[in-house]
Curated annotation (Swiss-Prot):
InterPro entries: Mon2/Sec7/BIG1-like_HUS, Sec7_C_sf, Sec7_dom, Sec7_dom_sf. It holds the Pfam family Sec7-like_HUS. Residues 262-287 are annotated as: Disordered. Activates the ARF proteins by exchanging bound GDP for free GTP. Plays a role in maintaining mitochondrial morphology, and in the turnover of mitochondria through mitophagy. It comes from Saccharomyces cerevisiae (strain ATCC 204508 / S288c) (Baker's yeast). The gene is GEA1. This is ARF guanine-nucleotide exchange factor 1.
Amino acid sequence: MHDVPMETVLAVNPATMIVKECINLCSAMNKQSRDKSQTSVAALLGGGSDIFLSQSDSFVDSFHNLPTSSYHDPLISGLVQLRLKINDLKGLDSLNALELLKPFLEIVSASSVSGYTTSLALDSLQKVFTLKIINKTFNDIQIAVRETVVALTHCRFEASKQISDDSVLLKVVTLLRDIITSSFGDYLSDTIIYDVLQTTLSLACNTQRSEVLRKTAEVTIAGITVKLFTKLKLLDPPTKTEKYINDESYTDNNLKDDIIGTTTSDNDLSSTDDDSAVADDNKNEKPVQQVIREQENDEETAEKAENVEPNYGITVIKDYLGLLLSLVMPENRMKHTTSAMKLSLQLINAAIEISGDKFPLYPRLFSLISDPIFKSVLFIIQSSTQYSLLQATLQLFTSLVVILGDYLPMQIELTLRRIFEILEDTTISGDVSKQKPPAIRELIIEQLSILWIHSPAFFLQLFVNFDCNLDRSDLSIDFIKELTKFSLPAAAVNTSNNIPPICLEGVLSLIENIYNDLQRFDRAEFVKNQKEIDILKQRDRKTEFILCVETFNEKAKKGIQMLIEKGFIDSDSNRDIASFLFLNNGRLNKKTIGLLLCDPKKTSLLKEFIDLFDFKGLRVDEAIRILLTKFRLPGESQQIERIVEAFSSKYSADQSNDKVELEDKKAGKNGSESMTEDDIIHVQPDADSVFVLSYSIIMLNTDSHNPQVKDHMTFDDYSNNLRGCYNGKDFPRWYLHKIYTSIKVKEIVMPEEHHGNERWFEDAWNNLISSTSVMTEMQRDFTNPISKLAQIDILQYEKAIFSNVRDIILKTLFKIFTVASSDQISLRILDAISKCTFINYYFSFDQSYNDTVLHLGEMTTLAQSSAKAVELDVDSIPLVEIFVEDTGSKISVSNQSIRLGQNFKAQLCTVLYFQIIKEISDPSIVSTRLWNQIVQLILKLFENLLMEPNLPFFTNFHSLLKLPELPLPDPDISIRKAKMSRSLLSTFASYLKGDEEPSEEDIDFSIKAFECVKASHPLSSVFENNQLVSPKMIETLLSSLVIEKTSENSPYFEQELLFLLEISIILISEASYGQEFGALIADHMINISNLDGLSKEAIARLASYKMFLVSRFDNPRDILSDLIEHDFLVKNEIFNTKYYESEWGKQVINDLFTHLNDVKYNERALKNVKFWNFLRILISAKDRQFAVYTFLEKYIQNGDIFVDDGNFMNILSLLDEMSCAGAVGTKWEQNYENSVEDGCEAPESNPYRSIIDLSSRSINITADLLSTVGRSNSALNKNEIIAAIQGLAHQCLNPCDELGMQALQALENILLSRASQLRTEKVAVDNLLETGLLPIFELDEIQDVKMKRITSILSVLSKIFLGQLVEGVTSNETFLRVLNVFNKYVDDPTVERQLQELIISKREIEKE
């Protein structure tokens, strides 16, 4: 409730309302009175009416019906007095709040009043507080509110029916809740609040009360709990570091019996009656005396206000926790009902949820949580089978883990370990509890799920705090393994159906969290910047550390040496050893430590060890409690003496400058009597005093808690034993009483204590937990270690986690995926597998990555061997291809397509498989085995016509080489159909035979399979991922080439070879390391091209591949020679004119000459005569002539040529054929001449110009062969020179006049030039005439040559002969041969004249 202005709440004067309430109450009380008139008059008299008070007693006695003072009712009187006072004052402004409330409070607390009247009074009080009739403006508001709450907690009335009584108490509880949860509640003190808590909680826990009342009490106590612990968040924590020694009893705050409401005894009634009589007597006092009494009361009230108890705070919060603890403590489990325990747990949980983060600032509060409350939680978890109780307990446990987990590591570890044992159905030795039923285990898992739902980094936090701690177990890893184990559907057999999905959610949350973290950090940056983390290095050595510890526990000396050797102890110095024993003793046997320290030879080690403690500000017993958390005190007196002596010295030194400060000294708390100022002194015992006192404490602890001791030591006995032991005097009595009480209340628990199976739980708790909760310090600035980690450090921790659980997680996921019946679950699991694969890839867990992808591949059904696949196929059908004409689509039906199409999980795996492959950016992670599977899957799809290979990956290559699309495997049966319909299959019978006919269902499955493969993008995912291409991939592709044709692979043998070769060629052509594989793939290609039975198209395609290798990889393995010798020159039925004129044939030749233009002539192919033979064949294709000429021109005219005899003759033949090709030009020449003769317009251009020009250039090259002789590194021999002359001479007969005359002119220039190098000793000039020029006149072609050309030839012949004659290098035989030539044509006048000129010139030359 919130305070608001009065006028906004009430429409009537508050005084009027109070008067009405007084009248109503009086009326009700009068009706219930035996004599209404007496009661009324008594009320009037008791009310102090001026009519009666001003008269004498005789006047009053005249009223025969008025009772004596002994029958006056003070309750009614109080109401009447309040009404009259309000009337006199004309309002409430001059009244105190307590005056206003007092009459109502008296009725509430009066046991003689009926429940009905009490209910009316409660209604009035409810209105007063709800309608803000009293508020903070009243001076005595604090006292009024406190008195009200006190009256409510002590409410009494006459008993009646149970339901009626509970209805009254219901109003009490409701009003208490309204007051305390409003701002009025801030005025209450610790004592009052605690009283309210006791009252309300006792009502809530009393099963004899009605359900409504108990539930209302529960709501009230919950509201008060919220109020209290909300205030805890607002309190200022202690300003100095506070140490709290846990030596108090937790059983002081017990829940009291429910006594509110009805009267419990007749004595109370009589007491109440006596009080009423006295009250009535007082009310008959004179007015003056009444005024004096009121003044005295006011003075007392004022004095009380000055010494009033402060408003509630931390004290009642601590006491309240203790009260709640008393309901759930193991030793009280038989005293309280399950519902009471459940309520207590829920309230503690609410307290933790509200202000649990503030508990570490208050050591006393935190100590309650860390020890007794957590102990009770663990006990209930391990022993209870009550569902509701266990549910509340687990809710509290999860709240403690979430909010205070960083402060309670060992408590959490012990509890989770016990929970694991419960889930595993294992029992602890001595545990008499039965195995938990499935519903309980399900509840445990449900509640635990809050941990990972609350914090995605829960497992990471566990890993850092536990798994990386040498003294703690691998809690995170074991937790995850437990979840994976119970995620399997099989776990539901022994548990419940809900446990597997809950546990699976936990596993998936871990995967999701790691995956999300990885998405925020680049992998390359992680690999580059990851560093060694000391904690992770420590984690890696944990197994080694445990081995050392086990050795230590067996034999300390050997263990110490081993710890030093392994680097866990820095050196063999006593300081380093002591420091290790002090800081890292979680796994060390405390008894072994104690025996080591008390060794007479280890005195210095003992001193170093004791010096590590800080005993400042502690009593001796408190210091001993702390001391004995680190080791177990030995049993022999001499050993104890050494340790106590060292302790005494250290303790005395620590106290030399500090006094022992105890919070409750002055208050005398826990003392037998209140202390005076003289008792408050500084207690500073010397070493000897501490030695004696320490021994006495150890003996007292044994005496008080040893069950075999029957007569326990009293305080007097104890104090008498220590007389004169405090620096020669007696210890202060209060000091010894503190020690005595502390030991009596709280045993000093010795580590490694064992009391047998009956007390195994106590031993387990004390040995693992109590040692850390003996002293609690305020922890103000503690921060979660995870919050301090950089992102890359978090990833390294997650890497360590996943490395330990990846295999079991993936194994579990695959098992669940295999048996999952829901598509939704399958998708969820597959998504998790995908993320696990990415995590493996990110962290470079190569083996796990490959195993996962391989497993996925196996689940696609595509990686199954043929034999296994056949086993799975019930009815084997051939590969059927259905072509639907109206859509142009094809449907392939096969065993493989049906298997894939009918298995939805296999389809999912197929899509995911290629998606994972597509995302690989580091091919080094892919193993050879995985590469083999990838290729196997792709080939399986190719063989079954389930994918289209003509993607951009291939089409670009095809465009470059002008190749047609890759051929696909031939189906066993092909069907064409005008359109696809459901009745399609009814027409198959005419095409198919018997059992080979696919069913309608098979076609549907095949369509699904095709769509799945289409969505997977297998080819682009693998081969268009440039980052994925690697030498290992190429090797796998090439090793997959099968060059042996069998009955099994015959349908796709050739197509698959081409498919793999083409992929390999494309990949190596784009890779930087392609040269490494050029020779290898060339070898494969040569072997394949030599196979028998290849189709013409395949051989032609292989030729393009070979030529591509020649041009791209510099002719590896001289594959060009193989192409020419074994393909172009041999397989003429394939490589013919039609081929060379085709697009891909043209491209091959272009690539060939492009390659030859870029290499030196000494390449092997150019020295091969078969190459030149190939060129001769090539020029038969007109489109290729220019390419051949260009090649020849470059390598002949540029010089530096090496040609052998065979090559030279082939060159001449090529040139001669190319020169002859220009003969077609004679057609145009004849047409031109005829047009001129006829007077017609001559043709504008020669359509054969390009051919004529090419032939003309060939003639020039032939001439150049002779003109360059001597300028090259190699000279022509006689035969080569003669052959060249013959070639030119042959072109003199070319039907094309232009070419014939060009050849004749070239021949003349060569033979007549003085600079001609043909004049050598190797070749006689007359031989050139006889063997080179003259033979052309014997050719048949001469018959078709025009006489004009013949006369030109004869003119040149004449010049050559005369020139030789002048030089004297000719003979008569030559002349006679020349003369015979002229005589053939002497009938022509021109020839006759030429002959006469020749003879005349010859004679003149001879004369000279």
